[in-house]
Amino acid sequence: MDCVIFEEVAVNFTPEEWALLDHAQRSLYRDVMLETCRNLASLDCYIYVRTSGSSSQRDVFGNGISNDEEIVKFTGSDSWSIFGENWRFDNTGDQHQIPQRHLRSQLGRLCESNEGHQCGETLSQTANLLVHKSYPTEAKPSECTKCGKAFENRQRSHTGQRPCKECGQACSCLSCQSPPMKTQTVEKPCNCQDSRTASVTYVKSLSSKKSYECQKCGKAFICPSSFRGHVNSHHGQKTHACKVCGKTFMYYSYLTRHVRTHTGEKPYECKECGKAFSCPSYFREHVRTHTGEKPYECKHCGKSFSCYSSFRDHVRTHTGEKPCQCKHCGKAFTCYSSLREHGRTHSGEKPYECKECGKAFRYPSSLRAHMRMHTGEKPYVCKQCGKAFGCPTYFRRHVKTHSGVKPYQCKECGKAYSFSSSLRIHVRTHTGEKPFECKHCGKAFSCHSSLREHVRTHSGEKPYECNQCGKAFSHAQYFQKHVRSHSGVKPYECTECGKAYSCSSSLRVHVRTHTGERPYECKQCGKTFRYLASLQAHVRTHAGA
């Protein structure tokens, strides 16, 4: 059973605002409140009404509730109960309308009475008066010093100010004061010293809808409790703790969802496929996979989404907004999931483990790509040349090689590259920078992939195994070269003479016979060579001398 605070579903007015409403608008208010209560009753919900000064209170099941809350429980078509005491009415007319008519008359008398507005009480206290009717005769509710009217909650004053929920001092917080009835925006800074709602913008329109706008990020809320929870998120306050593992949450709904991870409860089941979910929002999103519904449409490009979070993250690609910032390095991201994955680069966490070889990965996509090495699956096929890839990143890089576009050019030598990462690695050949150092032997590399392959010489790991002969390799390029020895494929062809090779390095060496390039120079005598092996043999002649 869910619990609902009355203020979350009620619409409050000050006496001045209520006086501006005509009879039709007041009737509309009563109808809305009655419909809300009826809907909550049909959902078997508790309605909590905040009060003050109550000592030990019990709900309708005899369970204790907090000292500053009272509980109203609407239980049926011809009665409702308050603190377990049932109110029954004459069984005349439509059974389902009796309690609503009675509540309507209560609201009507209280709302339209002149006495009810002399002391500045808002309509949210109508519920307090209804609850008060169920108290024993010896209960002594507080009495208003100006008009003599009795209320259980006596903390609201005739000044229009109400006590701050944090410190008890009178202030003009968003939940304590309402602006005039005309549509406007009014700054209401809180006067108390310890308030998280230090400065908010409170907007009220003639439709009686309230919008609580966060001064920090501009996000607006209709429900005050949702707004307060949002403000807490800026301050990092997590007041709801899990009794099982101690994890804390900003919102009670998040805690409820988390608890189900311990209990395994999945109350939301899809009627189409039987899949069950612990969270209603995940369930709703899943249902849309069956219906095809995509209610969230981007105003910038017209793209539609079935999931609000995907829609929100997409919109940020247009606005450039990156609200999720890393606390370690300051890098910002458009969505929390990207920030979470980035955080693993700092923590070193690798939660995704291969069941075949035990290797762990930081990202699920990396694990999927790795698994294809075991299965041999290569689902990404190039339409131009038919080459297949197991990793989407390598596939995208390969596709760009067909376009011939090389937008990244080296300022030192003019050499151009298709990828910015390739240019960065190349630039290090000019600067001599080698930021990747082996922890075992201290050898440094300009490229991380080179370090990764080097580390395997220490660990003895050979993850690349030939399916045909079982031979294993520590380097991907050696493995690919070996596989071509079985297939006879020679994809690297010289444009000058047409000679083909099974690996790109062999083609590069061959091309030097046409260009005359001799990139390997002896530092002692200045002699140049076409091949690295030739230079190494030459250097030995100096050492022997």
From Swiss-Prot:
Q: Does the keyword Transcription apply?
A: yes
Q: Where in the cell is it found?
A: Nucleus
One of the GO BP terms on file: regulation of transcription by RNA polymerase II
Please give the PROSITE patterns that the UniProt record associates with this protein.
KRAB, ZINC_FINGER_C2H2_1, ZINC_FINGER_C2H2_2
Work out whether the entry's keyword set contains Repeat.
yes
Please state the residue ranges covered by C2H2-type zinc fingers: 212-234, 240-262, 268-290, 296-318, 324-346, 352-374, 380-402, 408-430, 436-458, 464-486, 492-514, 520-542
SMART domains, from UniProt?
KRAB, ZnF_C2H2
Protein keywords? DNA-binding, Metal-binding, Nucleus, Repeat, Transcription, Transcription regulation, Zinc, Zinc-finger
Can you give the residue ranges of the KRAB domain? 4-99
Q: Which GO terms describe its molecular function?
A: DNA-binding transcription factor activity, RNA polymerase II-specific; RNA polymerase II transcription regulatory region sequence-specific DNA binding; zinc ion binding
Main localization is: nucleus
Q: A cellular component term (GO) from this record?
A: nucleus
What domain of life? Eukaryota
- Return the Pfam families for the record: KRAB, zf-C2H2, zf-C2H2_4, zf-H2C2_2
Family as reported in the entry's similarity comment: Belongs to the krueppel C2H2-type zinc-finger protein family.
Function of this protein? May be involved in transcriptional regulation.
Q: What is this protein called?
A: Zinc finger protein 77
Species of origin reads: Homo sapiens (Human)
